[in-house]
Design a protein with these regions (language model features):
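Immediate flanking context of iron-sulfur cluster ligation sites
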Residues: 63-74, 111
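Short connector loops at helix/strand junctions that flank enzyme active sites
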Residues: 34, 47-49, 64-66, 81
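Short, thiol/selenol-centered motifs that function as redox-active sites or metal-ligating centers
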Residues: 46, 73-81, 120
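C-terminal binding/interaction regions
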Residues: 2-34, 38-39, 57, 67, ...
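Short Gly/Pro-enriched turn/cap motifs at secondary-structure boundaries
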Residues: 40-45
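Alpha-helical support elements that line or immediately flank enzyme active sites
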Residues: 78-93
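Short beta-strand elements
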Residues: 48-58
Length: 148
């Protein structure tokens, strides 16, 4: 079980049950061997760093599906929770649908975040987009949705 640091204990009351659950019991945490895409982002102000790893396969329709996703995050409870929830939100989606997951979707899925922690949802969405961009860059492809 992950222990709360002093700052997170005082913030516990402002975190939703979903945030606390994903912080204490993060899903899909850890690295990945030979990912198809990897995105790392950080915030120099708070020091949070997130890395998301993705695996992609084509389904019977020929659509590229995000079949596996995991994360490594160094940061506060909200950073860990947003990393955890975005892996659940993106897994099994087409790459285009995963690309459209925004920071607001992440925060909503967690039942909201304190205003001072919304930057964590930005990092999670940016890390996912970075991993997807890297996947297509390595394939030397640029689907139209990447422009959005």
């Amino acid at each position: 079980m992950v222990s709360l640091n002093k700052r997170d204990k005082s913030a516990k009351q402002s975190y939703t049950k979903q945030v606390m659950d994903h912080f204490i019991n993060p899903r899909n945490q850890g690295g990945m061997k030979n990912p198809d895409g990897k995105g790392t982002v950080g915030n120099p102000v708070c020091g949070d760093i997130m890395t998301l790893y993705i695996k992609v396969k084509k389904n019977k329709k020929g659509e590229e599906i995000l079949t596996d996703i995991c994360f490594e995050t160094l940061g506060c409870g909200a950073a860990i929770a947003t990393s955890s929830i975005i892996t659940e939100m993106a897994k099994g989606k087409t790459m285009e649908k995963a690309w459209k997951i925004s920071n607001l979707h992440v925060a909503d899925e967690l039942g909201g975040l304190p205003p001072q922690k919304m930057h964590c949802s930005n990092l999670a969405a940016s890390a996912l987009k970075s991993a997807i961009r890297k996947y297509y860059k390595d394939k030397k492809e640029k689907p139209a949705f990447l422009s959005e």
